[in-house]
Amino acid sequence: MEISWGRALWRNFLGQSPDWYKLALIIFLIVNPLIFLISPFVAGWLLVAEFIFTLAMALKCYPLLPGGLLAIEAVFIGMTSAEHVREEVAANLEVLLLLMFMVAGIYFMKQLLLFIFTRLLLSIRSKMLLSLSFCVAAAFLSAFLDALTVVAVVISVAVGFYGIYHRVASSRAEDTDLQDDSHIDKHYKVVLEQFRGFLRSLMMHAGVGTALGGVMTMVGEPQNLIIAKAAGWHFGDFFLRMSPVTVPVLICGLLTCLLVEKLRWFGYGETLPEKVREVLQQFDDQSRNQRTRQDKIRLIVQAIIGVWLVTALALHLAEVGLIGLSVIILATSLTGVTDEHAIGKAFTESLPFTALLTVFFSVVAVIIDQQLFSPIIQFVLQASEHAQLSLFYIFNGLLSSISDNVFVGTIYINEAKAAMESGAITLKQYELLAVAINTGTNLPSVATPNGQAAFLFLLTSALAPLIRLSYGRMVWMALPYTLVLTLVGLLCVEFTLAPVTEWFMQMGWIATL
């Protein structure tokens, strides 16, 4: 029997999301206008809480949908205006260009990145050294490329290798269902479980590596670009400004990587089974023998484009998004990708998040119009200049560990800039606060997948169920990194940031604008 019109509408609304989630969103949409009539300030904070809730529930429904509905209603009832949203989007055009073009550009360099990580995995036998290599490689790549892309590449390598061994273990050459272990005998299952543990630890090291590298440069994370633009910093300025905090954090993060592997804490320490290594090595040898001259030229071209990318970013030859567009043009032209649909695939990863970011800016417009963060900022600014740095770092860290970094970073840098323009803080203090905001937004956010987009991407990928990587297990495995990165970052903001920045100024390496 066919379902009723009402039931059909209910099923279509937010698709496969749970009924309680759909009901919660409908309640939000009904309650918000009523509370706005009574107290716009309370309604504004309620909207922010609801939006953070949609981000935290990203596994139930992509936040663009519920967040977008809340943002549309906010504009309709007068919490902000469509004109103000347009101004926020225009002010952050560089970030949108970064997401649209840079992420798509790196898509056409995936073959090179796959080659790099495959070589690392098979050529380094020591698990401690391999983990460190994955962490360092992910950190270095994330300093120049998009973290999501780096994680996507590592996921591709892991899924590929898992599939190769799964087919051998199940004794079926055409093994398409990688989640079906029913055809695998007991001995192979033990080895497969060990292999899963090995891949889990590598993925977590790589994920944390993207956070360690991503915080260091203005292109490492989208919010970095927003903060750099607000402070008027270019690539080199940003790197030097952050280094009093980010360099010690990087060193301690890498030491943590070695420590958890050595002591086999928090689910780390599993080695690559020798049987699996033999199978993977055999497959890699076969692939190398089949590689044509055309394939080799593609890898060489992608490496040259990588050099161009790093050089163009370091010398600030153009806006970041435009450099990404140049990568798309060069990579497609010189590797023979000419089909419109093949080029279009590169944009599928970034455009949903670009749309979500536009919704962020709508909520930011509400925050500005309703002056929601004014009491918090006033509280922080009443403290001494030295204490302000730690307070900004802590408030950013708490919010960014459960919400999206771009959202949090944008809110706080806007408030700090407004305080500077009103004369509440000096330009010099504002620049130090920008560092505290950036590091506070990036470092503690490794605590949960909600905070790090790369972690969320890993959790929702096809790989996660294969290697038994759940939300809880990810939080547990991230815990040692969360503690070390957060505490070392806080200590550096407290004790090294101001004196080292002052020394850089005396040396003439940086200057207050």
From Swiss-Prot:
GO terms for cellular component: plasma membrane. Its main location: membrane. It is a multi-pass membrane protein. It is found in: Cell inner membrane. GO terms for molecular function: sodium:proton antiporter activity. Keywords: Antiport, Cell inner membrane, Cell membrane, Ion transport, Membrane, Sodium, Sodium transport, Transmembrane, Transmembrane helix, Transport. Pfam families: NhaB. It catalyses: 2 Na(+)(in) + 3 H(+)(out) = 2 Na(+)(out) + 3 H(+)(in). Belongs to the NhaB Na(+)/H(+) (TC 2.A.34) antiporter family. Na(+)/H(+) antiporter that extrudes sodium in exchange for external protons. HAMAP family: NhaB. PANTHER family: NA(+)_H(+) ANTIPORTER NHAB, TRANSPORTER ARSB-RELATED. This is Na(+)/H(+) antiporter NhaB. The gene is nhaB.
